[in-house]
Structure formats: structure tokens, C-alpha cells
Amino acid sequence: GLKINIKQITIPVFYSLIPFTLITLIIMMTAPKIGAFEENLLVNGLNQADSKMQITRTQADNVSASQYNVAKGTTVIGDSVALRASEWLKQAMPEIQVDAAVSRNLESGLQVYQTDISNKVLLETVVLALGTNTVDNYESLLNQFIEKLPKGHRLVLVTPYDGRTAHNASSLAVKTRQYELELAKKYDYVFVADWYQTAIEHPEIWYGTDYVHFGSETTTITKGGELYAQTVKQTIDEATK
């Protein structure tokens, strides 16, 4: 019968794998290392995705447990700055539910908001952490958020901060903030968490950054996250007195 020499088979296979192994090692050695900023966004994004099922379950329980009443708690609809701060928001307010995404603006945030309203999953306090990704029709969109807010809820607007244009009164981010301040004066259920003001007062968290996303290394990322969460929590505490 046919005799198979195992050595004759394994030796060619072994040598055929050498180029593949070398290529893999080269890729590993030359792949760019991600910085603190990218790593933080990646980790927070993964954590948020991991908690989606838990959030959905909690929301469903809240709806069934309060047929006609508004469920207690806080829903955050935010952008990449809120995503960056999500870890500290959850530390400051463990029951908070954060839905934040990179590049989200007022327009795309409104779609998320409307979906949450349709699904009856908005919690009592709704935090809109949007505006850094500017839009021309910010007034119209903010008005829609207010008009569509279901009865029994309150709205907290986190003012946007862009350090590159922070002192330019004609910039869209600054104008968006100004309009949010006006809305808070007009409606007794609308409040402002002035992240812009906090950011101005803490230049130490902006060294080495793009002046939109706080922190260039672990210490300043942590400091920025704590300040962001503190700004939001203080406003919510005042609103719920």
C-alpha cells in the first residue's frame, strides 16, 4: 500500500508558514499605537455598546412599572464629548443612561430623541449634550426638542465648547450656547449645564488637545471627565430640588 512519510508533509508546511509569521510580526511592530484620546473613545464606545442590553432592559422595566407616570432617572443624548465623559457621568450618577456617538449633532440627535419618545423610554430628566458639531439651523432644532418634550419631563442643555472659536461671538458654537441660555430663561423646565463656562475656567485640561475633546493624557482626561460630570450633575441636582 501507499506509505505516507509524515516528515515529508510537516517540513514543507512548517517552511510555508514562515513568511506568514514574518508578515504578522512586521504588522504588529509597525502598526501605529493609539494615543490616550483614541484609546479613551474606543474604551468608552465599547463600554457603551456593552451596556446597551442592560439599558434596554431597564427602560422596558421602567415603562411597564409606570404605565402613566414618568420614570425617574436621566437620559443623556450626546456627542463624542459626552462619550468621552461617559465613564465619569456614570460614576457621578450611577443610574444615568448615556447614548452618545461620535459626530452626532443636533439634527441626528433629534432623530434619537424622537425614537426614544416613540418607544416611551425617555427618563424624567433629558440631557442634550450636543452642539459641538455645529449646524446652521440650531434655533429651529432646539425649538423642536422643546416642542416635542413629553409632559412631566425636564430638559438640560449642555452648552458646547470649541476652544478654537470660544471667544468668537459669531461662531456657531457660541451662538448655539447663547440661544440655549435664552431658552432656559424662557421655559421653567429647561436648564443649562454650562460646560462652555467650565471649560473656559480650566485651561489645564486643554493642553495638547484639539480644544474640543478634553485631555491629552490620563490625568487631564480624568480631570476633564470629572469636571464635565460635575457640571451636569450640579444642574440636575438644582433642577430636581
Briefly describe each language-model feature range.
Residues 1, 168-241:
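Catalytic His-Asp segment of secreted/periplasmic serine-dependent ester chemistry enzymes
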Residues 159-160, 176:
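Extracytosolic low-complexity repeat regions of secreted or lipid-anchored proteins
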Residues 99-101, 158, 193-198:
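Conserved beta-strand termini and adjacent loop/short-helix elements that scaffold enzyme active sites
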Residues 129, 158-159:
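Alpha/beta-hydrolase-fold catalytic nucleophile elbow
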Residues 151-155:
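A short helix->loop->beta-strand "cap" motif at the edges of active sites that frequently abuts
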